[in-house]
């Protein structure tokens, strides 16, 4: 499991989600083999949610790395929040 794209604080969370997705994929394979398609649909949905969360965590890490590289090149970055009104 490659955790290079995650922030240090997110690594344990990402590992836990990846392990859960792997376990669910084994269960999904078994459900398909047994012909339990309702269970397979449920498991596939859970895997989708977990992988979306993992992707968001990885994107957050890549964004941080990109911001650091930009700052090293002399680009001044600030956080801008917008009002939702």
Curated annotation (Swiss-Prot):
The keyword Ribonucleoprotein does not apply. Changing residue 17 to E: Loss of interaction with DnaA but not Spo0A, partially prevents toxic effects of ectopic overexpression during normal growth and sporulation. It holds the Pfam family YqaH. InterPro entries: YqaH-like. Changing residue 38 to K: Loss of interaction with DnaA but not Spo0A. The keyword ATP-binding does not apply. Coiled coil: none annotated. Keywords: DNA replication, DNA replication inhibitor. Interacts with domain IV of DnaA and with Spo0A. Binds to and counteracts DnaA replication initiation activity; overexpression decreases the number of replication initiation events. Also antagonizes DnaA's transcriptional regulation activity. Ectopic expression during exponential phase stops cell growth 2 hours after induction, leading to filamentation, aberrant chromosome segregation and septoid-trapped nucleoids. Overexpression during sporulation onset leads to dramatic reductions in spore formation. Part of the prophage-like skin element which is not expressed during exponential growth. The element can be excised during sporulation, leading to possible expression of this protein. This is Small protein YqaH. It comes from Bacillus subtilis (strain 168).
């Amino acid at each position: 499991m490659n955790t290079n794209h995650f922030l240090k604080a997110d690594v344990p969370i990402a590992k836990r989600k990846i392990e859960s997705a792997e376990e669910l994929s084994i269960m999904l394979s078994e459900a398909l083999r047994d012909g339990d398609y309702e269970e397979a649909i449920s498991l596939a949905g859970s895997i989708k949610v977990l992988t979306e969360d993992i992707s968001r965590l990885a994107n957050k890490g890549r964004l941080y790395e990109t911001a650091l590289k930009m700052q090293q090149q002399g680009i001044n970055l600030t956080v801008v929040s917008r009002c939702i009104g």
